[in-house]
């Protein structure tokens, strides 16, 4: 049976795109995703929510000179709708919001073009957005931007984000007063009277499902009703995310909510809030990301959908950069460049021979100082890992001027290239051997832990038994349990940790986080 072509249906207040597998409905001209029909489910999105609270791009912004990470929350609504591509193989539509001086102090001074793409035979849809600030516009700060989907709570109960991080989650109702007890911050709630008693006594906290950018390429939800259905957020590249590969961001959490976070100050603070001045021109493409839908045959284990989503993620990664986005602001592979070389560590106190940078992190980022990539949040970054011999290839880099940055697990400090590297379309640059000399004043006398930027080797205590997420019991991510900061003073009531070199074991004797003590006043 031939695969039917993609059809576009335009109405006064809605736009519907149908490829025979799914029907995607968006408000016109707002560009809010109001409906996703798939596999005989009329709408995967939460139908009890207002249409503007189902699938949307949003941001948090503030006036120039403001400090902190808060500001005005804005669900981005378009003011004009345009058809960019309408063919049997592809439909791409645009919902644009233009800024004018009459909107000063009311809206963030950005032109925002939200795009949605449906392809023939494709079980899902793509979205990306183009943000542009013109040179003569006023300044602003941008604390956050993301794409959010609110799924049906009566359907999607099983969340998966990694092979060892997946579980049934409670209902959003369980977080409300009477069923949930607020804890130290609003996101953390103790479930005292949940609708389903098996969740009683658990802590629900969306931050417990955060993930490093480098590890957050697919996450989402499974509806276990037969036939089972999955909804997945696939991020095929990290080039448009801020903060580098070890920046943590939110993923999926109780709602059921699924996020693609492009820019966020979570876990970092104001350093990761870009500040734009008057007279500063800026443009950035966030995405595309892929919302993948899959279904299981009757009788199949619904968790198979997670395995299938991982396979699809691999396909999307291999397809990057996509060939089909119509915007000229998204360069295709032949409009990008490539960099290759080898990273070597030179440390005579470890070895008289050069040391291959085994599984080091190396990336191109905007010009700056060593380590500045961690705070860079306006432009693009391109990261990869070296192999066991230190060799690396960074493919499909946007044209421009960059510094090359790196760090190597097992060695302290940051590498930075001495000179700028200019990437040009279609050009491959071979930089040869790069030498990194870690900073030191002499031989290592002693050290606590392993310099790999994870703290995974240190002592993580068991949580208070009253505040447990069962997912993280005896788990590599047990540091995500609620309230561990309070355990420090309980374990060391008379003073801070005393670590004795040569006797103490950092796996047992060094608390994984440096936290303040609670001061009690009677």
Task: Indicate residue ranges for each PLM-predicted region.
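Short, ordered beta-strand-loop transition motifs
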Residues: 7-16, 28, 82-90, 386-388, ...
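Broad, structure-driven detector of short, well-ordered beta-strand segments within folded domains
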Residues: 21-28, 113-118, 229-234
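Beta-strand-rich N-terminal accessory domains
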Residues: 1-60
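Short loop/turn motifs at secondary-structure junctions and domain boundaries
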Residues: 7, 108, 374-377
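Solvent-exposed loop/turn segments at secondary-structure junctions
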Residues: 23, 31, 43, 98-101, ...
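Structured domain cores in non-transmembrane regions
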Residues: 48-91, 160-183
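Long luminal/extracellular ectodomains of secretory-pathway precursor proteins
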Residues: 78-81, 102, 118, 125, ...
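Extended, loop-rich substrate-binding clefts of extracytoplasmic carbohydrate-active enzymes
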Residues: 9, 59-136
């Amino acid at each position: 049976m031939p695969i039917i072509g993609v059809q576009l249906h335009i109405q006064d207040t809605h736009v519907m795109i149908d490829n025979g597998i799914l029907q995607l409905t968006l408000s016109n001209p707002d560009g809010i995703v109001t409906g996703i029909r798939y596999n005989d489910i009329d709408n995967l999105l939460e139908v009890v929510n207002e249409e503007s609270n189902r699938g949307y791009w949003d941001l948090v912004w503030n006036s120039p000179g403001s400090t902190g990470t808060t500001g005005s929350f804005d669900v981005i609504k378009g003011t004009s709708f345009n058809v960019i591509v309408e063919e049997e193989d592809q439909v791409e539509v645009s919902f644009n919001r233009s800024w004018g001086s009459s909107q000063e102090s009311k809206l963030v001074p950005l032109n925002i073009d939200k795009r949605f793409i449906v392809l023939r035979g494709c079980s899902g849809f793509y979205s990306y957005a183009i943000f542009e600030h013109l040179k003569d516009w006023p300044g602003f700060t941008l604390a956050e931007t993301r794409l959010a989907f609110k799924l049906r709570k009566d359907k999607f109960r099983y969340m998966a984000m990694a092979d060892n991080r997946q579980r049934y989650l409670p209902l959003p109702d369980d977080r409300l007063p009477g069923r949930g007890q607020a804890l130290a911050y609003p996101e953390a709630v103790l479930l005292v009277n949940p609708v389903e008693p098996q969740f009683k006594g658990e802590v629900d906290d969306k931050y417990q499902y955060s993930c490093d950018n480098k590890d957050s390429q697919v996450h989402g939800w499974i509806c276990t009703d037969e036939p089972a259905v999955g909804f997945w957020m696939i991020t095929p590249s990290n080039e448009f995310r801020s903060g580098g590969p070890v920046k943590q961001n939110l993923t999926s959490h109780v709602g059921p909510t699924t996020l693609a976070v492009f820019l966020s100050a979570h876990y970092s603070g104001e350093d990761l809030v870009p500040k734009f001045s008057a007279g500063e021109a800026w443009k950035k493409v966030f995405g595309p990301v892929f919302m993948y839908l899959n279904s299981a045959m009757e009788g199949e284990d619904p968790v198979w959908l997670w395995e299938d989503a991982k396979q699809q993620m691999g396909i999307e990664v291999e397809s990057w950069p996509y060939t089909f986005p119509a915007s000229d602001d998204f360069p295709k592979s032949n409009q990008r460049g490539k960099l290759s070389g080898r990273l070597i560590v030179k440390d005579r106190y470890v070895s008289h021979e050069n040391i291959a940078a085994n599984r080091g992190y190396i990336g191109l980022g905007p010009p700056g100082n060593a380590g500045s990539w961690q705070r860079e949040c306006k432009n693009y970054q391109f990261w990869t890992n070296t192999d066991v011999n230190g060799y690396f290839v960074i493919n499909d880099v946007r044209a421009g001027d960059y510094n090359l940055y790196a760090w190597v697990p097992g060695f302290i400090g940051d590498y930075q290239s001495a000179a700028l590297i200019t990437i040009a379309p279609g050009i491959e640059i071979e930089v040869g051997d790069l030498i990194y000399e870690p900073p030191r004043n002499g031989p290592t006398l002693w050290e606590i832990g392993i310099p790999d930027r994870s703290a995974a080797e240190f002592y993580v205590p068991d949580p208070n038994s009253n505040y447990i997420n069962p997912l993280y019991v005896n788990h590599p991510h047990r540091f995500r349990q609620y309230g561990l900061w309070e355990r420090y003073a309980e374990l060391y009531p008379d003073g801070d940790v005393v670590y004795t070199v040569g006797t103490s074991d950092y796996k047992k004797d060094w608390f994984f986080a440096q936290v303040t003590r609670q001061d009690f006043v009677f």
